[in-house]
């Protein structure tokens, strides 16, 4: 699954797996030159049962419950013993969302492939899409009995969020001949998110006598002489992020001793924009303005913060064996941000 361990572990049925291993895997450059970089890169190795190789496997799950709960999933998998595979996973569920907000849902699609073209060229890649909508409505009424006077307060809140993401990666290796290797990789991601919230609160010095779930829609029916203050707040935010990364490496073994010359090029870019605003209105019923009306405090805020990051890296290395167990490596790296 092109490094997506979560997708593999959560979606592949356990009865398809014969072996599961986690180990530190050498990079293509380390395998070719025999020199370790010292960095740990753990990989998850899943092996399917032999009787399932060269077989198309499909699976569908449908679940419905009370409070409009649902869990729908479909899978198509194809595996071969040499590591080639093709998998498609689709899921739509609100099973794990605790709120009964009408639009709560999590939808996901995933496609993964690994293929070898003869003995010289191989490709691994995946594309994932995810949509998550989550909202909640709540209300509260509170009474406090104090020696200096009782206090009564109520609040109502509604919030919802919508997040989407698209992620993809591609890995390739080309064994040009016994002495030359070309490796390349790339990935990109796009993530837009939206959040909205509305809240109201009020305080009184006597019980308002209105059901707290309908208090703000019937606020005018509350006696004026017991009102202390009322606050209304609205906010909305949107953020959008893009990213991509690509890398390419060429390694050439110059002689039978293992003298190796390597060239690596990498480029990463990410950009995005965060935008938010909030509106607030607070009325003080016990504090009058110069005209004798209730005092009102208004607060309006707007924020916008664009972001951009770009980097390049070019590396050149030379590896020379010195004896059977010793290798000398000289490298030069140039980078910019």
Regions found by a protein language model. Give the residues of each.
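Short acidic/polar hinge/loop motifs at secondary-structure boundaries
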Residues: 2-26
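Primarily recognizes Gram-negative and organellar outer-membrane beta-barrels
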Residues: 5-6, 24-72, 82-337
């Amino acid at each position: 699954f092109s490094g997506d361990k979560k997708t593999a572990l959560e979606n592949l049925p356990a009865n398809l797996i014969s072996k599961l291993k986690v180990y530190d895997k050498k990079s293509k450059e380390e395998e070719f030159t025999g020199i370790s970089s010292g960095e740990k890169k753990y990989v998850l190795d899943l092996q399917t049962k032999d009787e399932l190789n060269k077989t198309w496997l499909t699976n569908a799950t449908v679940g419905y419950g009370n409070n409009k709960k649902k869990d729908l999933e479909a899978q198509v998998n194809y595996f071969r013993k040499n590591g080639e595979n093709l998998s498609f996973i689709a899921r739509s569920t609100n099973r794990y969302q605790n709120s009964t907000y009408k639009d709560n849902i999590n939808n996901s699609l995933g496609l993964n492939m690994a293929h070898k073209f003869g003995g010289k060229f191989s490709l691994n890649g995946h594309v994932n899409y995810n949509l998550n909508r989550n909202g909640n409505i709540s209300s509260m009424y509170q009474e406090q009995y104090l020696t200096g006077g009782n206090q009564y307060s109520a609040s109502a809140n509604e919030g919802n969020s919508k997040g989407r993401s698209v992620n993809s990666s591609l890995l390739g290796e080309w064994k040009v001949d016994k002495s030359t290797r070309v490796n390349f990789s790339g990935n990109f991601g796009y993530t837009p998110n939206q959040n909205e919230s509305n809240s109201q609160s009020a305080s009184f010095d006597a019980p308002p006598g209105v059901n707290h779930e309908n208090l703000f829609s019937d606020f005018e029916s509350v006696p004026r002489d017991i009102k202390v203050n009322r606050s209304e707040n609205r906010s909305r935010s949107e953020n959008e992020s893009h990213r991509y990364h690509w890398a390419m490496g060429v390694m050439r073994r110059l002689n039978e001793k293992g003298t190796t010359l390597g060239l690596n090029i990498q480029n990463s870019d990410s950009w995005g924009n965060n935008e938010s605003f909030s509106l607030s209105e607070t009325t003080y019923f016990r504090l009058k303005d110069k005209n004798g009306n209730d005092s009102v405090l208004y607060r309006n805020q707007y924020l916008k913060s664009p972001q951009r990051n770009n980097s390049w890296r070019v590396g050149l290395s030379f590896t020379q064996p010195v004896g059977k167990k010793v290798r000398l490596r000289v490298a030069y790296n140039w980078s910019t941000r």
